[in-house]
Amino acid sequence: IYENQTIKSIISNGPLGIDFISAGSSVVGLNNLNHKQIHFIVSAINELNSMYDFIIIDTGAGVSEQVMEFVAASNEIVLVTTPEPTSITDSYSLLKALYKRPDFDPSKVCIRVISNRAASKEDGSIVFNKINSVVMQFLNGSLEYLGYVPSDAMVEKAVRQQKILSIYDPTSKAARSFEEIAK
């Protein structure tokens, strides 16, 4: 999986003291991992717990077995969704699949929601309330709202420049929202 490298050897140092592991360079076949390989990666990541305050695994969208394994192994989940109906449906589908897993105990996991590309603060709250009400009604669970990230043209500009938005334009609406959510 890691081409015979340790997890510590494939860590890259990013700006502002944020380290990362790129799925593109050293991790082979990330989308085609079996159960044993995923558990190997989760164990390797757990070795890093003493080195970092937070370890974030960006699984991407969907309810694939790989996504579900990583999510189920987490003690905190941040679900990022958008106001589009398909995104809200996909978010609920992931949560429903998660709640059905025998290895998932909702009392031991904090699930938080960020509304991304929301038109306004109110729009972000509406998105959260839709998902949370369905989770409460059908899964007997509840979610925590972290906040919203407004739709912001600066995000696309930073992506095109391959820059971190908070460095590219720290005064942009989205960057200020990131900072607020991080608090």
Model-derived regions: residue spans:
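Switch/connector loops and helix/strand junctions flanking conserved nucleotide-binding motifs
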Residues: 29, 121-125, 155-158
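A cross-taxonomic marker for long C-terminal extensions/tails that follow the last structured domain
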Residues: 160, 169-183
